[in-house]
C-alpha cells in the first residue's frame, strides 16, 4: 500500500471513529461562538446544535464546523472544554444575574434570601453533559431559563411558596441533561424553557 493510500485509510478510520461527549460539547461551544459573532443565524445555529448533540462520529461533527473560521485549529479532539466559573451564586438582600455567554459548571448552587436571581442557560456553553443545579429560595425569588434542546429533571419542594416542577417541551436526544433540585420557603423558584432571541 502506498504512503498516500495509508494516509487516506488512517483519515478514513479517524473520521469514522466515535465521538465522545467532550467532542460534542466542544463543537457546541464553537457553534455558540460563531452565533455570537453573527456568523450563524439563530435557526442555523439551533439546527447545527441539535445535530452536534446527536452526532456519533468525528465526521458528523467536522461537517458542522467546516465552513466556520478557526475550525481547523479548534476545538481539539479529546482536549479540555472551556473551564467553568464559580459554582455558587448568592443573593443576600440583593440580586444575581448570569446571562449571555458563560460556561455552565457541572454542579451549581443558587441561593436567594430576601433577594432575587436570574440564571439564563439559553446562550451558555455547557462543560458537561450532565448539570446538577441546587436552587434554594427563602423569602426570595429566582428564575432559571432553559434553552429548547436541553433535557430537564426537576425535584423540588415548597413550603408556603412556589417551585416549578414541570417545563413545557421536550429536549433533544444527546443534549445535556439539567437536573434541578432544591426548595423554597416563602419564596419562589421559577423554571421555564424559553426560545432564544435572534440577534438584532
Curated annotation (Swiss-Prot):
Residues 1-21 are annotated as: Disordered. Pfam families: DUF1707. Residues 7-21 have a biased composition (Basic and acidic residues). InterPro entries: DUF1707_SHOCT-like (IPR012551). This is Uncharacterized protein MT0994.
